[in-house]
């Protein structure tokens, strides 16, 4: 993982252009000239220089605003203090607030209905003392991709994803504390194993193949990779005194996946698509509960079950 932020080449005369690849999507940013923009260390591996000169799947214009205020209308969804979403026929507007900056939003973003074009406004007064900033800092990057996925593109899940020596792609799901980071550390000690993320994985179906994508949003093990791999098997983690792999029914697997999915629950069409996507996924990929103890032979238990 990079040890420090990567500064974007903004100058007083020219805006900054950069592109990222996350979850199979290209994200392009045009930052207002002179803006002290940087990439968070977690995002540096996701830089995509090959996309800089072309049109990206999601394009953002980033600029300053002298002031920002919340709308009078009630939001369609409020996270409980960090962000809120307001929808109308022109698209979706997000407002980001923090006690650090008072009641006024420190950032706002408008996305068109297809979540392919957006405009991000940064409240200049909130960033006066900042030498650098990342315009798409979490949770905005995840929010935008979560909404784009819900338009028929895939789903983000609370999971660890990895690729074994034989190219088998394993997905381990669990809420916080279920053992994703512990499982990640067990597999990290195995030669030839590639980890995609220890906390958030994007799932998509492309050319008839279900694929996993790593994301920048890692867990305690600090694993984040832009890599992708076909999905071979799904395991729901449960900590136990010993190892046991227990196949589960397709309806139960779909329900367990939905409980660990990130999606805009206030968008009916997004819920309907996600349910359909997970139903089809669990009819195609074997799903099991993995009861395990945090010992190295847990790895062999998975390999034996998938053999």
Task: Identify the meaning behind each predicted range.
Residues 1-176, 186-194, 201-307:
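A noncatalytic interaction/capping subdomain that flanks phosphate/NTP-handling catalytic cores
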Residues 178-180:
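Conserved glycine(s) of the Walker
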Residues 183:
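Hydrophobic positions on the alpha1 helix immediately C-terminal to the Walker A/P-loop
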């Amino acid at each position: 993982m990079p040890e420090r932020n990567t500064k974007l080449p903004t100058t007083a005369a020219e805006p900054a252009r950069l592109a990222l690849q996350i979850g199979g999507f290209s994200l392009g940013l045009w930052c207002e000239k002179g803006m002290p923009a940087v990439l968070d260390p977690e995002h540096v591996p996701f830089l995509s220089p090959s996309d800089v000169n072309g049109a990206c799947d999601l394009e953002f214009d980033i600029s300053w605003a002298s002031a920002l205020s919340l709308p009078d209308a009630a939001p369609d969804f409020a996270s409980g203090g960090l962000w809120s979403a307001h929808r109308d026929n022109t698209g979706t507007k997000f407002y980001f607030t923090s006690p650090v900056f008072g009641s006024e939003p420190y950032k706002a973003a408008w996305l068109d209905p297809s979540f392919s074009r957006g405009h991000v406004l940064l409240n200049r007064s909130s960033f006066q003392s900042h030498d650098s900033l990342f315009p798409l800092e979490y949770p905005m990057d995840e929010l935008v991709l979560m909404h784009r996925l819900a338009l028929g593109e895939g789903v983000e899940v609370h999971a660890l994803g990895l690729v074994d020596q034989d190219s088998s792609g394993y997905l381990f799901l669990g809420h916080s504390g279920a053992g994703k980071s512990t499982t990640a550390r067990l597999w990290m000690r195995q030669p030839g194993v590639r980890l995609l993320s220890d906390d958030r994985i994007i799932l998509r179906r492309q050319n008839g193949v279900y694929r996993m994508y790593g994301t920048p949003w890692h867990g305690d093990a600090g694993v984040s990779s832009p890599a992708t791999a076909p999905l071979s098997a799904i395991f729901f983690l449960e900590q136990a005194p010993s190892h046991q792999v227990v196949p589960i029914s397709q309806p139960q697997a779909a329900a367990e996946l939905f409980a660990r999915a990130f999606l805009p629950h206030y968008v009916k069409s997004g819920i309907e698509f996600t349910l359909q996507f997970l139903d089809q996924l669990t009819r195609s990929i074997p799903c099991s509960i993995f009861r395990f103890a945090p010992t190295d032979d847990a790895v062999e238990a998975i390999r034996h079950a998938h053999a």
